[in-house]
């Protein structure tokens, strides 16, 4: 499917959270994302690939650790090898150039964005932590049932457990997109984005910041 709208995007590293004062003397919690060394490594076009997109590389890596096919790919783009690569479908892909560097100035303060990342892994979790179940009563004869899920299906009807039943299991460590966050400030000198609120992932996690797909 061909992209019909212009989308900007950058890969960056989540440095953590802090708080800053705004112009109304309100304390705003922000997430700091460092998005330096983004570069265009490939251009997709409708004639050859069937769709238009740009491929963005991010993060330094020892050239000795790069496979020969990837080394040739980066050499063709005229850039040093990058650790992370992501593809962004955008209608204005033809306006980019191979090897072009992208900066945080793609975004502006007040702009709505989406942030994609991998959530923190929580390990094996019960239904109360994983799905917000209330559990069983704390007294009145409840015996070692306080954090159990309760019934997961009748014996004769439906005599099975439905697919998708919320149960205990591995929690977190999944790809997650947070929509319609706001850019609080842009520090071009330090390649920093200050984003209002929280974004998925732990400190040091690589995240993808793009213009909001749903506007808001």
Curated annotation (Swiss-Prot):
Pfam families: Ribosomal_L3. Residues 137-158 are annotated as: Disordered. GO terms for biological process: translation. Gene3D superfamilies: 3.30.160.810, Translation factors. InterPro entries: Ribosomal_uL3, Ribosomal_uL3_bac/org-type, Ribosomal_uL3_CS, Transl_B-barrel_sf. Keywords: Ribonucleoprotein, Ribosomal protein, RNA-binding, rRNA-binding. It comes from the Bacteria. GO terms for cellular component: cytosolic large ribosomal subunit. One of its GO terms (molecular function) is rRNA binding. Part of the 50S ribosomal subunit. Forms a cluster with proteins L14 and L19. One of the primary rRNA binding proteins, it binds directly near the 3'-end of the 23S rRNA, where it nucleates assembly of the 50S subunit. NCBIfam families: L3_bact. Belongs to the universal ribosomal protein uL3 family. This is Large ribosomal subunit protein uL3.
